[in-house]
Curated annotation (Swiss-Prot):
GO terms for molecular function: GTP binding; GTPase activity; ribosome binding; translation elongation factor activity. It is a peripheral membrane protein. Required for accurate and efficient protein synthesis under certain stress conditions. May act as a fidelity factor of the translation reaction, by catalyzing a one-codon backward translocation of tRNAs on improperly translocated ribosomes. Back-translocation proceeds from a post-translocation (POST) complex to a pre-translocation (PRE) complex, thus giving elongation factor G a second chance to translocate the tRNAs correctly. Binds to ribosomes in a GTP-dependent manner. GO terms for cellular component: plasma membrane. It is found in: Cell membrane. The gene is lepA. This is Elongation factor 4. Its EC number is 3.6.5.n1. GTP binds at residues 19-24, 136-139. Keywords: Cell membrane, GTP-binding, Hydrolase, Membrane, Nucleotide-binding, Protein biosynthesis. It is an enzyme of class 3 (hydrolase). Its main location: membrane.
């Protein structure tokens, strides 16, 4: 059932691979519909965080309402929902897509289809969206729009003959894109009289309004004063304000089925208004929630410690503030003998981890040390209990472990065919299992591998880029767990275990990794007045050793000639002193040492 009002609404999002010009296209659409005056136009209007603008990526989903007047005089309300493009934020993308009826697939005319173009496109198809291909960057001399159209038809299988050819940078043919949205994206439907059902596709904390939920009303209507209930948490709130984004907040009287807007209800914490949850009325609630909700599950863990131990409380407050805005971030206190008090934090992926670290340093001015990232291992102990291990230091002794499993991801790598050998070589080095490969066209190949998450967690992406001169693109999703023969590698300095350097590695690689780490640390740790042995150990067995030689004073400088026994006495005395020093001396480990451990030798 569709009302007259709904016929003039279009809800759509823009999906693309990183850097194909998604946020710039959004800017042009905002400009072309006159949503903001020229003075207010700022590049990448929808990327609010400084970090987003700097890295040129979108991290949080955003929404904006555009009013488009056709030449025929009809007025359409277009709700644009801008989504993050990075694989770490896949769940957020899928929720944003669930709020739409259509998606603009932006493809770079010079690059063609890349791994995330496909991944995001399939996400859109899973949500039954109408896909409108738009080919961008046609002002570049290397653009090849006709070939790219053909590629879209062959690889994705959607009609692309009349895809608008635009340049988001110069604003060329933007009107064609707007017309395509109106003509191809279906109008929303949904009964305005039915009980309220609204999907939260983003939520964040505002210091004045509390938590602001971005919602898409699927059925019913919501207005100020309505008592609402969140279906997954069962909590009840009273609506304080509803409105739409122009990109700034503009309060309205009510939002009805088909509308996209925001609602505030003095909710204190983002965790209570999870992305993907369903809002309904407390008095007249819907029978079932909208499908597809799942809590955010962290995949990568890392320890974060303040360089200055006194800043522990500040770090805790900073993490709490970030968590208010980022439901996917989890943290719990932990202590390390080497680093003192800190937190074990869980992230969606590496980019997410990187961004959180950068925000801690930038927005909160904290100096932090981060330990090597690790994943969740599942361990079945000999007595039958199952534990999940996120920190290598807590690994039980080998005699207690019956079975150990590690997470496996399904990864798709799209690369120019010249580099297939290099990519396969890299994937095999990282314990990848080859699944299949298909040629997308004469020059590009898609390779599918199953790789342990542990192997791609740190620098797989960098290695892939350097082997393919930056041409390959990569996308992954977790598919499950598989048993593996893993051991814990410890590093001992001066015979003390440095817990923050411990890591879990496959048994057959332990020796090489231990040797490598010992050599790296030898280069990085500064010389002391006494000799420092660096040892790598698996259990009680030492598998590699390097020694940092002591600095020594020339005690014989003042002896000119003379008796050998006098010299011997001085040397013996020096030796004794060094021995004593070594018993009481402690070794300072510089921050670079923690970083060096992560860099694996290719």
């Amino acid at each position: 059932m569709q009302s007259e009002r709904q016929k003039y609404i279009r809800n759509f999002s823009i999906v693309a691979h990183i850097d194909h010009g998604k946020s710039t296209l959004a800017d042009r659409l905002i400009e072309a519909t006159g949503t903001l005056t020229e003075r207010e136009m700022d590049t990448q209007v929808l990327d609010n965080m400084d970090l987003e603008k700097e890295r040129g990526i979108t991290i949080k989903s955003q929404a904006v309402r555009l009013i488009y007047k056709r030449d025929t005089g009809e007025e359409y309300t277009l709700n644009l929902i801008d989504t993050p493009g990075h694989v770490d934020f896949n769940y957020e993308v899928s929720r944003s897509l669930a709020a739409c009826e259509g998606a603009i697939l932006v493809v770079d005319a010079t690059q063609g289809i890349q791994a995330q173009t496909l991944a995001n496109c399939y996400l859109a198809l899973d949500n039954d969206l109408e896909i409108v291909p738009v080919i961008n960057k046609i002002d570049l001399p290397s653009a090849r729009p006709e070939e790219v159209k053909q590629e879209i038809e062959d690889v994705i299988g959607i009609e692309a003959e009349d895809a608008p050819l635009v340049s988001a940078k110069t604003g060329l043919n933007i009107k064609d894109a707007l017309e395509a949205i109106v003509n191809k994206v279906p109008a929303p439907d949904g009964d305005e009289k039915a009980p309220l059902k609204a999907l939260i596709f983003d939520s964040y904390y505002d210091s004045y309004k509390g938590v602001v939920c971005h919602i898409r009303v699927k059925e019913g209507a919501i207005k100020e004063g309505t008592e609402i209930k969140l279906m997954n948490t069962g909590k009840v709130y009273e609506v304080v304000e509803v409105g739409v984004f122009v990109p700034n907040y503009m309060p309205v009287d009510e939002l009805k089925a088909g509308d996209v807007g925001y609602v505030t209800a003095s909710i204190k914490n983002v965790r209570d208004a999870r992305v993907g949850d369903t809002i309904t009325e407390a008095k007249r609630s819907a029978n079932e929630a909208l499908s597809g909700y799942r809590p955010a599950v962290p995949m990568v863990f890392s320890g974060i410690y303040p360089v200055d131990g006194a800043k522990y409380e500040e770090l805790k407050e900073a993490l709490e503030k970030l968590q208010v805005n980022d439901a996917a971030l989890s943290f719990e206190p932990e202590t390390s003998i080497a680093l003192g008090f800190g937190f074990r934090c869980g992230f969606l992926g590496l980019l997410h981890m990187d961004i959180i670290q950068e925000r801690l340093e930038r927005e909160f001015n904290l100096d932090i040390i981060t330990t090597a990232p690790s994943v969740i291992y599942k361990i079945t102990k000999t007595d039958g209990t199952l534990i999940e291990l996120t920190n290598p230091t807590n690994m039980p002794s080998p005699s207690e472990i019956k079975l150990m499993e590690e997470p496996i991801v399904k990864s798709s790598i799209i690369t120019p065919s010249d580099y297939v050998g290099a990519v396969m070589d890299l994937a095999q080095n990282r314990r990848g299992i080859f699944k299949d490969m298909q040629y997308l066209d004469t020059t590009r190949v898609s390779l599918n591998y199953e790789i342990p998450l542990n192997e791609i967690i740190y620098d797989f992406f960098d290695a892939l880029k350097s082997r393919t001169r930056g041409y390959a693109s990569f996308d992954y999703e977790l598919i499950g767990y598989k048993d593996a023969d893993l051991v814990k590698l410890d590093i001992l300095l001066n015979a003390d275990v440095v817990d923050a350097l411990s890591m879990i590695v496959p048994r057959e690689r332990a020796y090489a990794k231990g040797r490598n780490m010992a050599q790296k640390l030898k280069e990085i740790i500064p010389r002391q007045m006494f000799e420092i042995p660096i040892q790598a150990a698996v259990g009680a067995k030492i598998i590699a050793r390097e020694t940092i030689k002591a600095m020594r004073k020339d005690v014989l400088a003042k002896c000119y000639g003379g008796d050998i026994s006098r010299k011997r006495k001085l040397l013996e005395k020096q030796k004794e002193g060094k021995k004593r020093m070594r018993q009481v001396g402690s070794v300072e480990v510089p921050q670079e040492a923690f970083m060096a451990v992560l860099k694996t030798e290719e």
